[in-house]
Amino acid sequence: MDLDIIVQNKKNKILVIGPSSSGKSTVMHAWITKGLANKKEICFAYQYNIIKKYTTRIFHYNLLKCYEDNNSSDINTDKLLEKILTIKPLFVYILFTNEEELENRISKRRYNEYEFFNEKKPYKREKRLEISRNCNYIELYKSLIQLLEKKEINYSILDSTNPKFTKITYDKIY
């Protein structure tokens, strides 16, 4: 993965953002396995207000949180993301998975971030499926990319539909 290059520079702050089951934890776990990051450097978005004063450099953000909290596919309504985007320097990895594959993953998933918490916290499949089915993914990705460009934040889009995490451009999404 050429995305390892950004992670190798320990000064970089990194946001990995994508819908539930898009592969955020898979990417981060690969970095840990390669020795490019450790678990203490990772902050799940919901923890941000609690641990922001600590040296955290990799942020795990569920893109569906915006829809879940605000019933909107407009990322500009997401106050927590707005706070995280003020971190400098920040590089963003946007994970894109086609909706059919995403729904398949969500329907089969049993646990919530097991590789990070080492406990079998049940994954709320039905709730996630409902959110996923109601969300306008194209609008969500579009508003995220427009926001990043407006704020002049560097980003890469990775197609996580298959395990190779291929780099793509936004025209493959919308």
Cite the ranges covered by each PLM segment.
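Short secondary-structure capping micro-motifs at structural edges
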Residues: 74-84
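Hydrophobic anchor at the beta1->P-loop junction of P-loop NTPases
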Residues: 16
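Conserved substrate/cofactor phosphate-moiety recognition/catalytic segment
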Residues: 28-73
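Extreme N-terminal, non-catalytic leader segments
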Residues: 1-13
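A glycine- and Lys/Arg-enriched "phosphate-lid" helix/loop adjacent to the NTP-binding pocket
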Residues: 85-144
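The conserved Walker
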Residues: 20
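Walker A/P-loop
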Residues: 25
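NTP-dependent small-molecule kinase module
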Residues: 2-5, 135-174
